[in-house]
Amino acid sequence: MLTPIPLLQRFFSSPLSIKEILQACDRIGIEAECSNVFPDSLNTVVTGKVLSTSPHPDAERLSVAIVFDGKEERQIICGAPNCRAGIIVPVALPGAKIRNALGEVTTIKKSKIRGLESLGMCCGADELGFPHLQTGERGIFEFPENTPLGESACLLLAGASLECSLTPNLGHCASLLGLAREISFLSDTSLTIPEEFSFSPLPQESHSCDTHNLEASPVFYSVKISGLSWKQSPEDLQASLIALGQKPLNAIVDITNYVMLSLGQPLHAYDSQAVDQKSLHATTVRSPQQLTLLNKETYTLPEGALVVADQHNILGLAGVMGSAASAYSESTTEIILEAAYFLPQAVRKYQRTIQLHTEAAYRFTRGIDPQGVLPALYAAIHMIRALFPEAQISPIQKIGEYKSDPLSLNIRPKTLKRLLDLSLSPSEIAEKLSPLGFQTIAEESSVRVEVPLYRHDIQEETDLVEEICRTTPFVQKTQKILPTYTPIYALKRSLSTFLADSGLQQFFTCSLLDSEIAALSLQESSLIPVQNSSLKLRDSLLSGMLKSAATNLNRQAPYVYAFEIGNVYSKEHNQYREEEHIAILLTRQVMDDSWHVKTPLSFYTIKSWVEKLLCHAGVSIEDFVLQASQHPNFHPYRQAALYHKKQLLGVFGTLHPQLCKKSQIKHDVVFAELSLNVLLSLKKKTEPHYVPYPIYPSSSRDITITIDKDLPADLVRRELLSFESKWLESVHIVSVYQGKDVTSQSKNISLRLVFRDHERTLSGQEIEKEYERLTTLLDKNLANIGKGNS
């Protein structure tokens, strides 16, 4: 946003220096810089005030001036006829280089003129490179009375401007008034409204309209103005618009643009001849409509789009742009001027649909001040009346009423302490927020805050904490080192370091997938693409990683060992969810450099990586159950799902051959994807501790049993471990057999039970007795194993 300093200064009760304005912008959170750059030699030409003058004792045409340059008083010998006490002039300090009357560059030095010391020079505009600003007889340039002292004179002469980059939450600063209001809160000045925007109310008439959409446009004003003609706006208005970055067009359009850029309220003028019954309102489109806008482009407005219309025709897309058919033109003698409050979401949705970005849409989509609609309309009407004295103004037509109460929030000292480590009482918090335009009531343990209607960015307690943060000097802020990361961040950092140290490369792929990459997945997504785009949010890390792996392999990478940590999105029961996942992808054959043997990738390769990952995360593999899964992206017989009770942690296995073919990868790919949110919830908080090596021997016994072929052998192993036994140390699966002498619906599994006592050596009789007890319990419970597990 281009912001001319002279225009901005008019909104301050006392002028601020450019440095003070830039410092205030930094505290607001606005990236701002001065757009005019001059040679260093001219940076020492500053504004100064002539305090007194007296005739030179030895020169009739010279005077001795005492000038204050913002820092100190200095004596300057001046020959300009207009040098007098009280004026503010450009003062070239020693070291500055200016052009003299002959056009030669002269360096200003401390010198003596006719016996008196001169510590600088009072300059004319032409001597600083601005001859077009020099008026009348040759003399020194005079600045306005409220010009701050010590400022760069060249910046002021050039009409210095700020280039401001506004973040989306600073929509209330997208005008001279809004920016000046925020700067005044954070500096030693107060906000004042220039006379050109201070007008008394005008007559109004309220009326209703059955088709007006009060939800999307709570209040809508329109006024008929006749007796107009086509003409250009005055030079000073054109100059102001140019300084604001707008091209002057004609008087009416220039006024609406100037009011919008100054006060933040978009306005639009319609040719009255194009408006049926001279009445406007905001309504929604019931079916798709074609509309040609002012830019001569034709757009298809979707059903539900908010538009400005009369009784029969659509005259513009509300908050974005008017139609070409209703545009103000050279033949227009009567207009209907519209000013309204449109809800940000009502404008944002359909403005994005047609991909049209305008100055009006920029402000409406971020939220305007609903209390500023009528004052902006008054300002435009009075400016039009000043340019067209014969114009006739009809009473303002009003539809609706903005009745929304200000948002009320509570801010607690303990929240401030937790987030900023600032210890403030409720009364101190209220003192910090009140100067920012908030209405505050300090209570016993909190502060009740009413948010101004123009602050659409303040929605919760943490937003108020941010307001206090930006008004607190750095020297008062905490010396305590706050936690640098959250538990989920610590887990991500730990796992990424572990996997990188294990030889895997980290991938970073985009959360938005185009149709080509999204099509790599065989799973149907529950998310729909972004409007007017083939992009959609990913529901898995797989597609992006596959695309990256294929790119690396096509560039002759011998293999791809990679992992990624990122967000995935899903929709369940009309609720959108965002989770953080971690994925591992391994493809192509792996070469063991020590033996030069190629080891094929398999289901068990990725299973071992999952086990190592869980172990490093501080989660025991014993806490999980492996179950068969039917995920469409995996080989139907080489995949598994990992569950903790009924909670799914993730899936892993060999990818489906068809998926590899679609990705143009000729080798097997194994893949695992786990939920970091679930993993964090299961992470044990105990610190690692030392377990001594056993000094007494163990003894093992094997057992072979027949179970249902669909029952996982691991469930039987876990069942044995669940029995209370002070000697059973571990249970291992030795073999699983299906074939001869075993029915087609059954399988044999062999388990090895390891017994040990850490205080003595067990006897064979003790082991046999414990073995018999455990196998008897297993026989009794065998029928119930697997029931209730999912």
From Swiss-Prot:
Swiss-Prot/TrEMBL catalytic activity: tRNA(Phe) + L-phenylalanine + ATP = L-phenylalanyl-tRNA(Phe) + AMP + diphosphate + H(+)
Membrane spanning residue stretches: none
Entries under SMART domains matching the protein: B3_4, B5, FDX-ACB
Cofactor field: Mg(2+)
Record-annotated tRNA-binding domain positions: 39-154
Molecular function as annotated in GO: ATP binding; magnesium ion binding; phenylalanine-tRNA ligase activity; tRNA binding
Record key words, sorted: Aminoacyl-tRNA synthetase, ATP-binding, Cytoplasm, Ligase, Magnesium, Metal-binding, Nucleotide-binding, Protein biosynthesis, RNA-binding, tRNA-binding
Domain FDX-ACB stretches: 694-790
Predominant localisation class: cytoplasm
Cofactor binding, note field: Binds 2 magnesium ions per tetramer.
Location(s), subcellular: Cytoplasm
Membership in a protein family: Belongs to the phenylalanyl-tRNA synthetase beta subunit family. Type 1 subfamily.
Record's subunit section: Tetramer of two alpha and two beta subunits.
The protein's name in its UniProt record: Phenylalanine--tRNA ligase beta subunit
Encoding gene per record: pheT
